[in-house]
Amino acid sequence: MEASRKDSGGRPTIKAVAAAAGVSTAAVSQAFNAKGRISEATRRRILDAATELGWSPSATATALRSARTRTLALVVRRPTDVLGADPHFSELITGLEGELAPRGYGLLLHLVADVAEESALYERLAAEGRVDGAVLTDARADDPRPPLLRGLGLPAVLLGAPRPDAPVPTVGLGNQGAGIHEAVDHLMELGHRRIAYVSGPGELLHTRLRRAVFEETLLLKGVEPAAVLTTDFSEAAALAATEELLGMAERPTAVMYANDSMAVCGIGAAQRAGLRVPQDVSVVGYDNLPIGRWLHPRLTTVDQQVQRVGAAAARALLAQCGEDVPDTALDDRPRLVVRESTGPA
């Protein structure tokens, strides 16, 4: 019995999933192919069994899915107001579309509130056969999405630092902490010792990494961070954090922000408080979005090549969909771009 539930490579089979869910193999096919009539409860039981067994229909995707949709999903877990104020995702989408559109692929964008809603959406998209794959953003510790998508038979790529142990291909610049390290060194060379950091949500892996590199770089130089504040990336949170920092008895002489959008808010808050940037407080962003080049003063920031990463992610996902695409490797790292928002302490 056990042998019939595993293939020659020792991997679980569709029969094993069917047996675990108490259904026929045809029902398993219907659950992943959105054909036939099965109840939502049965579909859920099949998907749970597939996930528990670690079974993916990707090896038999051609048999289970009669046609490609030529549509890929981008699901973003952000409030609409935060997404609307942050050009990061516009840059990412530009990079994705630059590779998808010429090949006749479209991008399906969804906004969700939490991980449960995001997981349910992937399950629905897979069951309805609406997309051929998904681009995952905002990697988290113990991220449930990669194994879920593998179980659903949906190709996926995860944006972030390359991780050979990741359950799905990861696409991003290497040495993610390099830009933060450069930024701290730059500020210290300018004489700054009271340096604060405005971080993003703590559950995001890239947020944790950047914050850790910021703190470690300072401590290695014998300097304590002036403050580290956590936000949700929103404009309101960035303004509140900046006002808190500027109200300190010994206010920071420099503030680093987790993205350019918050840095722009920070510059505005400082100027409204009557402070000059960079004469009274230096500001550093992260992303190198176009808006930073049009500010006064122009924003010093870390360039993580968002469009280029988006393009590489699209190529990696297209390759999984059977398309002939160029190499997806990114042989670069985030780099500091020095402009006029930083100056001597």
Regions found by a protein language model. Give the residues of each.
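N-terminal helix-turn-helix DNA-binding module of bacterial transcription factors
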Residues: 1-70, 345
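Bacterial carbohydrate/catabolite-sensing allosteric modules
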Residues: 2-7, 20, 52, 98-102, ...
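Short beta-strand segments enriched in small/hydrophobic residues
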Residues: 27, 67-81, 186, 194-201
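Short, surface-exposed alpha-helical segments at coil->helix boundaries
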Residues: 43, 90-93, 146, 207-215
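Amphipathic helical "hinge" segments at domain boundaries
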Residues: 55-121
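Short beta->alpha connector loops
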Residues: 113-116, 137-142, 261
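Short, well-structured alpha-helical segments in soluble
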Residues: 118-130, 239-249
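Acidic, Gly/Pro-rich loop/turn segments at junctions of secondary structure
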Residues: 133-146, 161-168
